């Protein structure tokens, strides 16, 4: 509740994609940009091309946009994503929208930046399948269009082009995928008290009150990222891990000692995937804890949770209302965060909460 205060602030209304020097959309803070990777039009253009190039997969059929489609709110609407040869991983594809505001990347926060994150899917066997990044560099150093774009963006050609520049360009493009100005933003920060429906307004009260959603999906005085950028065990996936936690942890640690990468382990092993943040921190307290995702555009980014196990927003509300389980008679995880407990919401409150979450949709995605 301490994060939520009713004040009014007017900000610039802006649509995707965000120009280099533009103010942030209504409801969002200034965009964090690394000092060593400033935004430029040339870099963004290059990053856009890299993001959509299917030659960077072993089959020539998969690119970043395969799992992050613009016309599907930069997700793929699958429970878990499909890579080369229709191989599936273990995780639901997070939206790229507003990923630039996240303190860490991936569900378990295993990479600290968009730059670091962008390199991993290329070399994951269930995503784009390359053995290493050499094929990417071979293409961009020889392709005439890439040669021109890299020279304009970085002043580099030939062997001067490395994965550092590739990652920086992709990250620069992803930092343009920004969206605010939702009905909630216009209601909360724009002073338009008719921007949300009566049901959504009631849902907002549930969100900040009895539902306690705001404890993790933060709303602040002048902006709302709808995430605290922290990791929590809310009970998702517990049944997969139940009674074999020690065995799975031991197997994972042994694999790491043999040189296995976390990125590959968590996407190719269903049990390892459920370790969550523990796979990164090594702390038992982080078992099955996953990053708090933003709720912006949530109506367009289902299925939900790290494993895509909840199909609808109604399922999500039911899951939380039951204290960390979709079915009230299912067992509860013994590792639940302390704040996860039954909410005792009425059917009307649950319906209103769903309507509020639908009011977090930015106009450019409203018709998707």
Task: State where each predicted segment sits.
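Short linear regulatory motifs and low-complexity interaction segments
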Residues: 335-337
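Post-cleavage N-terminal segment of exported redox proteins
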Residues: 2-46, 50, 102, 117-125, ...
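Short glycine/threonine-rich turn/loop motifs
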Residues: 23-120, 185-310, 315-318, 326-331, ...
